[in-house]
Structures are given as structure tokens and as C-alpha cells.
């Protein structure tokens, strides 16, 4: 009986915490203001805050288009998740002769490390390297493409189908290889959480040492004009840009994924189907606007309703050590708004031993982020339940069973 009471009380602590937030939701004042979206030339674009997934700007973001070489973000992500950087990649005849366009002139039988290949893929957009990486990771390109599509589904992509690892879209690929700005933002968000990916995409120049087929160093340059003056003499350099990937084919027009960081907030911008130089000018304009008008708030640091005891929380008032707000959770709000104006809603999580529930916040009709409610790891038997009346426990047990 004592064990059941302890388990029940742990659940009640969570329920009381949820109830606390639910009551205070009624006190959140109506907040209607959301900054008006700026104008852009590009027909398809999105700006997403990286830590929350909040969409700040949406212009036809789920419309299907050819991605061109921004495809290689997915290729790089899968390689990093499935391989070590020091693995040796050997270039097949297919990798060398079944690709064209951008590349670094590798030969059949040439060997490079996975790390060197990924720098070539992300900086020089080397198609033969993307093909070789796909063969190495998946065994065959076909298997790797299936991995790409499986990963897209896992990330919640809504309008994506990959048909190759490099983004060239000719013949069959012109209709079978497609994605959208929203999906590319999800893929970019997942990739950016990888430390090695962040290091690669932020690199301006890189040197591949001599190989078994090349006697000299191969010099690589990042084609992202927002972090490295590659062809435009620096007119599109953006001080807050920390990486990205370019793309272009005649079918796709110009595509661009970039990351920018300012004031502890990271934004992801995706541009598709653009006429150059709109991919650069629109990205910079969007970053400037959303950095100027939005701020990031840490939920654990700002959600004070638990500590303030704004309602009688019963067990929670004496037993709050069981649960806490995950310090990794954030929300993003217009700078004119206060944290308390965001309305919280709590849902339970039955899929994890550590995550008990999740708080999601909305503001002016927008989902702006949230945080997990997690167990602190405090054992139930460290808390004295002597102050819990037996009849109260019986009533609570019945209520809990009903739910």
C-alpha cells in the first residue's frame, strides 16, 4: 500500500504542476501583435528558429521544387550519423563518370577520408564526392537514397522525395527528386545539431592532402557568399552567418540554406526557386528583420508560476523536487511581448522514462516553442508521505484510475 501511495504521489506532483499552468493560462492577456512579414523577391522562402522549430516567416514554404545541391545537407547528415570521419572512401567508376557539374576531379580508385569527402561535398559541392559518400554509407546509391527518404519521414517532412545524393535533376530525377522550403528547414535543423556539421559548414577554406591519385594538395573554397567571398568580392558577406549550402540547376534555379546566430538565437533561412542574386539579398533582409524583431526566452528561467505558488497546488507545494522544467527548452517571441503573454498548454508524454510532460506555448496564434517537464531523479522513498491522509489517497487513486 505504501509503495502505491508513493507512485501515486509522484503522479500527483506532475498533475498539480500541469494544473497550475492550466489555471494561469486563463490569466494570460490577449496578445494580437505579430510583426508583419517583410517583402521578398524569391517565390519560396522560410525562416525557422533553430532551437524551437518556430516558423517566423513562411512564403509558399511547402510548395514542391527541385532542391539542387542543398540536397547535400541530407547526404552529409546521414554520413555523419553512420560513419567515422577517418573511414576510407574509395571512388568507384560510377562515382566518377555518372556525375558531372561541380566537382574536384577525382579519379577511379582514388581514396580519401570521409572527413575530406564531406568538406568537398559541403564547400565545393563536389558531386562525385557525394556519390562516393552515398555508396560508402549505403552500400549502393539506391540504398542510400532510401536512407535519405526514411530520414526525411522521421524528421516530419511533408513534401520531399530524394532520388539521388547530390541534387542534379535531369531526366527521371527532374520529377522524382524534390523537396520544399519547410522540409529543408527541418533537415537543416537536424544537421545543425551535429557539432561536426556545424564545423564543416562554417569553414571558409580547406585543404585535402595528396592522395593515391593526386600528388598535390586540393584546395577547397566555400561557395556560400554570406561567409566567404567566393565570386562576388564580398558584397553579400553577412557577419552573423555561420554556415549554409548553395544550390543551382536550370530546373531548380538558385537555392540556398543558411544559418545565422545573433544574441543567443540561431535562425535558419531557406530560399528556393530564386533568380540570383535574390537568394542572397532576401536571406540577408530576412535575417536582419527577424533578429531585429524577435528574441529567445529560456522557459526554465522565465516560467515562474510554479515557484510563485499562484494557486494551491497541494502535493506539489511540498514535493516539487520530483519534477522540473528542462533547461534546454526555449520560446521565441516578438521583442514587444513579455514571456508571461505566451499561453502554455501541457500534454503528457508516455513514451519516455524521463520526460513526463511537455509545455507548448502559443502567442498571437503562433506556436512559439516549449519545454519538457522532466523527472529530477529524486526517489519517491526520500520523501515523507506521513502527511498524506489515507482517505485522501483513496480518493485520488480513484480519480487517477478514471483518467
Describe each region flagged by the PLM.
Residues 14, 28, 50-51, 262, ...:
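Short, ordered coil/turn segments that flank beta-strands lining enzyme active or ligand-binding pockets
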Residues 17, 21-25, 52, 96, ...:
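Generic "edge-of-domain/loop-turn" microfeature
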Residues 17-18, 84, 294:
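Hydrophobic alpha-helical membrane context
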Residues 157-158, 175-403:
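Domain-terminus/edge residues, biased toward the C-terminal soluble/receptor-binding domains
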